[in-house]
Regions:
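Short, charged recognition helix plus adjacent turn
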Residues: 41-42, 60-67
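Short alpha-helical DNA-recognition segment
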Residues: 17-34
Length: 67
């Protein structure tokens, strides 16, 4: 699973929120929340940052690790 999707889903559940409640509190659409948690690859970063801000988190750019 996508690490951002996993983070949002785990923290939403830990906060005791349904997807609908999270959607309302964050002012994000329910469809977006569902797609984000399902790991959709093409989501708007501004909305991702709104979702992460609900848990006092943000996206950070870093170089990929060589495998």
């Amino acid at each position: 699973m996508n690490p951002i999707a996993e983070f949002v889903k785990e923290n939403r559940k830990a906060a005791g929120l349904t997807q609908e409640q999270f959607s309302l509190r964050s002012s994000l659409g329910l469809r977006f929340v569902r797609e984000l948690e399902q790991g959709k690859e093409t989501v708007r970063m501004d909305k991702v940052n709104v979702a992460l801000a609900m848990f006092n988190a943000q996206t950070v750019a870093r170089k990929k690790e060589n495998k």
